[in-house]
Every structure is written in structure tokens, then in C-alpha cells.
Amino acid sequence: ALHLWIVPRIGDFRPSLERLATRTMGMPVQIGALQAESTGWAPSFELREIRLLDAQGRPALSLPRVVVAISVRSVLSLNLEQLVLDRPELDVRHTASGQWLVAGLTLGTPGSENSAAADWLFDQREVVVRGGTVRWTSERAHQSTGHHPEDAPALTLTDVDIVLRNALHRHDLRLDATPPTEWGERFVLMGNFHRGLLSSHPGNLKDWRGQAFAHFPRVDVSHLRQHVRLGVDLLSGQGRLRLWSDIAKGEWASGAADLDLQAVSLRLKPELQPLGFQQISGRVSGHQGEHDWSVSTQQLAFVSDQGLTWPGGNVSVKYSQAQGSQHAKGLVQGEQLDLQALRDVALRLPLPEHWHARLNDHAVEGQVRALRLQWEGPADAMQQYQGEIDADQLRIQNVAASNMRGPGLQGAHISAQFSQRGGQLQLKMGQDSWLSWPGLLEEDAVTVQQLQADLRWQLQGQQLNAVQWKAQLSNEDLQGQSQGQWQPLASSQLGMLDLQAQVARADAGKIYRYLPLGLSADVRRYVRDSVRKGRVNGLQIRIKGDLDKVPMAHARDGEFRFAGHLQDVDMAYLPPALLPAGSLPWPTLQGLQGELVFERQ
């Protein structure tokens, strides 16, 4: 019947086809000319000068040539087997409210996501566009960069080839197009989507789920940001880009990007400083939900705008806001990380302000082999947390202007596990290393040639409840080991210390450097001024008791004893600082051999 009855008389059906198309599309349709060709099982029809009219009767879309193929199957379902559009010109706009306008015609009406035209289009088996021109405008993308949506610029794509294939609840799309020269080279977009079994409107994009893919062999991302909603503000960058986007309910839910870009600058949130890279390559993935977000990298290598090099480590950050009775949650994981580069990047990530303050207060360098931190509650008052870190060539220095400066170190390898209940740490240091703990020793920093230490601690709430350690230290001044524990006392400001230390050798003239500030200033000055040079061997140190009572004047207060063998020691028994003004100096004792004991006072 198709070949013998319809094909020879196709011209007679033009008015009927116009009425059918008008009823199906939901807008007036005019067909200038119609002819048919009978080839094979599926006859084809060529339509020329097709016009779709808007509500005012003006042409909203003109198609110079359209080829339509039908079959018995398509006729029975009132659809087309194939629809081919040659050299069409289309205006496509994605409005700030999320509506789609094609040639000024709305796919869907206000308050409804359904559109007869969209349903018809996505119900055809195959739609092909050849050599078209598309003017693409995204108000939503323009609005996401902080501009007024009505000022969104149009991107004109030429030589546009599109293939759309629709099956039951499935839609596959491919678009190849050439952008303006300054924008980049010809690119490809692909999408594979499906709808739920209960979806009755193919054109309702809110029912669509699936994945979209884009490949840009050469692109200037500063132009891309005006036309594609990326979830981040890409300020500049040129190079090669591949994008994957997961679509849920017709909206971007998550995605990934393979990068090979130069001169990149992006801003993750308006209040943050831009992230800048001289060069960056690898994969970046992200997710932005209503109450959560995540960022991760795979084999990402870059040179920052400050010249810092990241050779290719992996890191991921996840954060969920508090909702009702559910606490905020966070997770940071990483491996093969450069800490200095990571700190620079982290200051530009949307992390809690408390974290930014901590990072600004510390200079950090080193390589992290593995890192994991998981927590619940506000980041500045974590209710539960646990983590572990394995780092090498570590340097941490407090650079805060505040007088409350914390400990620091350089040239360390650490392995630590910790939680809100406590933790443990293994520390190793070698040549040209140093330790710093302002407020603990006479001098801020202690140089290290070799150090091994095991440290354990317990926490009760936000308070340190107990500390235990074992350590071996060697440097130019001394070689020795110590073990002990510390715990707080309600009646003491400095707490209770139980320390045993053995110093195999020590430079007698440098001992004052290692005296704790818990000792009175008079004692520390006396040791510094009186012991000029010499060696101390077999030094035994014992401190036990309330540190507020050092040097333990009474036996009931505890123990305080330093005892060792002296060799070739020069000592000013009464240093000038202790003599009355104008007094003659006491003779210096030289070449002393014997035993020196400091016990209590």
C-alpha cells in the first residue's frame, strides 16, 4: 500500500500532512513542496521549504530541505523511520529557569516539563542533521559566572552534524560541530540516556538519566565557561579537554575531566582565591549536591602559578553539611602527595574557614605516601574523627603572628594513627634535621643527626589526658635515650612528669640548651654561665613529680636528679653574674675530672 497507493499520490497528501504535523507539533506547520521516492522497503519523502510558525504567525524555524523515511512499523506507530534535515539553522537557548527553547519554541510550558514537540522529536527512530548551523545560548551557564542571564552571549557552531536515535525509553545522541576559530577546533558531544519505565513523555528531560561525553582537541576554556555549566568558574586555560557528565533528572549531578591544559585559572567559590597552574594534566572528578560536594584527582600532575610541582599524586575530598540530627561529615584521602603544593591548593578549595586559618599559620613541606582523615561534626569542633598518615621529608613550621606557637620539625619521616580518643606516632629523623617546641626548652630548635621516637597519647574530650614516649637522639651535642610519661593534674598547671633519660655522651658546654623551661631561670642561667667546656659521660636524668614544683625541693614533691661523669671540664663555680658588682672574678676550675650531681635544689 505504501509503494502502490501513497507514493504516487504523495502531493495530494500535503494538506493532510500539514494538519497532522500541526496537531502533533502543537504549532502551525507549512510545507512548500512534497515528493516521494519508492526505494526498498522504506519509501522516502523529500519536503522543501518547511516553516514552523510561532503564535504571531511568524516563521520560528525554516528548513530548506527535509528527507523523511517511513516503514510499515513507523506508520503503525504514527512515527518516522528516519528524519534527515539538510543545512538547517537553529537557535537553541537554555533559560535561567531550566527551560529549553528551540527556534523560539518552548519545549515544555511554564509549570510543566511536557511538550508535544519534544515528545514527537524524541519518539522518532532516527533524526539526522547535516551541515547545520546552531546558535547556542545558555542563560544558566552565564548566570553561574555571576552575570545577568539575559546578557548571555551566543555561540555559533557551523558544519553541525547530529545523529539522534530513539528507542523504547532510550535516547542516544552524537553532535559534531566547528566553533569559532578563537574558541577552538571541531569537537564532538555524545550522550546515552534512558528514562524510567513509567515515563510517558519522551521529551520531559526531568525523566532523563545517563551520561554525556565531550571531546575538545583544542579549546579555550575561558570561552567554554560562558556556554557550558561546569560547576566551577574557569577563568582561563588552553589545551585539550575531555569531559564526562552524569545526568540525573535532566541536571548535571557529577562529572570528570581529563585535562592537558596550560595557563589555567579557576575559582571553585566566589569568595576563594583562584587556583592557578602553568600546566596541568590528569583527571579531576567532582560532585555537587544540594548538601554535599566532592573533588578527587587521578594521576594529576601540575606546575602551579607559584612554580610548585606536583608530580602525579591522587587526592580526594568529600564533605556533607549537617542536616537535622545528622552531623556534618568529611573525608580526605590521598597518596603520593606534595604537601607544599597541596597546602597551596587547599587554601583555594571550599574547605571550612577554620582549616584555612590553620593552613595559613603553618609552612608545610614533604611527601605524603598515604593520608586518610574522616570526621563528624563541625570542622573546628570535631565530635568524632580518625585518621592516619605516612609522610617523608616532612617540614612543619608555625609562622603565625600569635605568641602561641606550636611545635615544628624538618627532615622527618612520620607514621601516625589518631582519633578523638588518642593516637600513636613513630618518628624518624636523620642528618640536617631539627625539632622545635617553643616553650619546652631553652632554645626553640634542636638540631638532629639521628632520632627515633615512639609516642602515644590519650585524649579526654578536648584535653590531653596522658602521653608516653620512648626516644633515641644523637647530634653534635649529645647522644642518649629517654622514656617516660606525662599526665595532667587538676592541681598543677604543667602536669605530672615521670622521665628517665640516659646520655652516653654530651658536650658539657651545651647542656644548658636541653634544660626544660620548667626549671627556674636561675638554674638554667647558672648551668649556662658556669659550665664552659668539657665532656659528660654516662649522664643519668631522673625527673618525677609535679612540674610546677621543679626542682622538687622536698622529698615528698618527687625526684629531680642529674648525675654524670665529667672529663676535661672548665667550670666557673661562681660565674660573674652571681658576684656583687665590682667584685673580682673567681678562678675558673679547669680540667675537672669526677662526678657531677644536681639533686633537687
Describe each PLM feature range.
Residues 1-26:
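N-terminal type II signal-anchor transmembrane helix
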Residues 26, 58, 63, 80, ...:
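Surface-exposed or flexible loop/turn and strand-edge residues in extracellular/cell-surface modules
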Residues 27-28, 44, 48-166, 182, ...:
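Secondary-structure transition motifs
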Residues 33-42:
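Short edge beta-strands and adjacent turn/loop segments
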Residues 70-74, 113, 197, 246-249, ...:
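Outer-membrane beta-barrel proteins
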Residues 72, 106-228, 235-240, 246-248, ...:
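Elongated, acidic membrane-bridging lipid-handling scaffolds
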Residues 80-82, 124-126, 207-211, 252-256, ...:
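Outer-membrane beta-barrel architecture
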Residues 84, 91, 258, 263-296, ...:
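Outer-membrane beta-barrel translocator/pore domains, especially the C-terminal barrels
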